[in-house]
A protein has these predicted regions:
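Sec-dependent N-terminal signal peptides
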Residues: 5-13
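C-terminal segment of classical bacterial N-terminal signal peptides
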Residues: 13-19
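N-terminal module-boundary/linker segments of secreted carbohydrate-active enzymes
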Residues: 20-71
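Active-site acidic/histidine clusters and adjacent loop/turn architecture
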Residues: 53-119
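Structured segments of extracytoplasmic/periplasmic soluble domains
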Residues: 64-66, 87-101, 130, 152-155, ...
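Mid-length scaffold segments of soluble, non-membrane domains
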Residues: 102-103, 117-151
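Catalytic cores and adjacent binding grooves of peptidoglycan-active enzymes
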Residues: 132-138, 145-227
């Protein structure tokens, strides 16, 4: 009996923050990109010397988010141009506050630099040096000033010779935008526009790119090393 009393006394004397340490506190930070990641970006042609922004201008963001089951994650990673890093951090802090569901936030490195694989996996991502879908000119993702959110719930569609192409094809069930479901971006467009991402691909006529938020091209060129 005496031992039980001592044990109870010890338990009651533990600091009140002990239980709080078991909770997942949100993580939002900006850091330089570690060498092993930049080397991987070069190896997988995610960045090369023809890109409009120098690799030293890019920052690694660590982000917390809620998934579609309401689980809390602290492992989100995204690469953004340094001049927009704080704004993007503010975006994801607000999405976290609203508990907006995000399937995952991983670097394109995890998909060997393949943007299609990233979209199919419903990955929210930002930097990758490439042309716009369909070709013709360099994508705003190449400047680190564009973000794609939940590609399955917010697909890219284009119409060519009366044939509609949906990317990723898993997003075909989300073409009807009047029926707002979890992960669709319409309820959070304001979060992006309030933080400088004035262009949303969901307002375009053809193609329509619901997942896509960006700065203007003039803003991107002004912020980058582009001449």
């Amino acid at each position: 009996m005496f031992k039980k009393i001592i044990l109870m006394s010890l338990l009651m004397s533990l600091p009140s923050h002990a239980s709080a340490n078991t909770k997942k506190d949100p993580i939002f930070s900006i850091s330089a990109i570690p060498n092993h990641i930049t080397e991987d970006m070069v190896q997988k042609n995610i960045w090369n010397e023809k890109c409009p922004v120098g690799i030293k201008r890019l920052k690694l963001l660590n982000l917390s988010y809620y998934d579609f089951e309401g689980n809390h994650h602290q492992d989100g990673k995204m690469i953004i141009i340094d001049a927009m890093a704080e704004k993007v951090l503010a975006v994801f802090k607000e999405l976290h506050k609203r508990k907006f569901p995000i399937a995952k936030i991983k670097l394109i490195n995890d998909y060997n630099g393949d943007d299609e694989l990233s979209m199919i996996d419903n990955n929210t991502s930002a930097f990758i040096c490439r042309e716009v879908t369909g070709g013709g000119r360099i994508s705003l993702h190449s400047y680190g000033v564009a973000i794609d959110v939940n590609p399955v719930q917010n697909p890219y569609i284009s119409i060519n010779n009366l044939v509609t192409k949906v990317s990723p094809k898993e997003g075909a069930n989300y073409i009807n935008r009047t029926n707002i479901r979890a992960g669709m971006v319409e309820p959070v467009v304001d979060v992006f526009t309030n933080n400088g991402f004035s262009i949303w691909g969901g307002t375009w006529n053809d193609p329509v790119d619901w997942m896509h938020f960006q700065l203007t091209r003039a803003e991107a060129e002004n912020l980058s090393d582009y001449k």
